[in-house]
């Protein structure tokens, strides 16, 4: 079974994907894993590669291609990433959501940052990503038609999600 898990920062995609992977006994690959692999292939650290990726949409496109290829090459796999559901063949496409303030609080705790700083960073990041996804891929992030299930992670603890 191929499962994609997507969602905005702070919704718990990485946590849920990891737990599901452990419980189902199938591998999990995140878009972040693919990004780190691509950086290593170029012998760059993550920060250097991130700066390059900001100016080069081909990197985002390659991440999506690689996740789609992984889905095609595996019978059982969990793919975690914001756009995984749009590019990978999957049996189940899951979107995790949570209220803005809940997400901000989770990120604030995880990254030991001031909540107001996190709120502003989220707003900037989400505007930027929505624009990039629209320009690069023609994807409207507010269109949820691609997903089979939408789960509000505010309603459950990570183990229950």
From Swiss-Prot:
Organism superkingdom: Archaea
Biological processes annotated in GO: pyrimidine nucleotide metabolic process
Binding of ATP, residues: 7-15
Keywords from the UniProt entry: ATP-binding, Cytoplasm, Kinase, Nucleotide-binding, Transferase
Main location: cytoplasm
Catalytic activity: CMP + ATP = CDP + ADP; dCMP + ATP = dCDP + ADP
Gene Ontology CC entries for this record: cytoplasm
Subcellular location: Cytoplasm
Enzyme class, first EC level, given as a word: transferase
Disulfide bond positions: none
InterPro entries: Cyt_kin_arch, Cytidylate_kinase_dom, P-loop_NTPase
Gene Ontology MF terms: ATP binding; CMP kinase activity; dCMP kinase activity
Documented EC number(s): 2.7.4.25
NCBIfam families cross-referenced by the UniProt entry: cyt_kin_arch
UniProt record similarity statement: Belongs to the cytidylate kinase family. Type 2 subfamily.
UniProt name for this protein: Cytidylate kinase
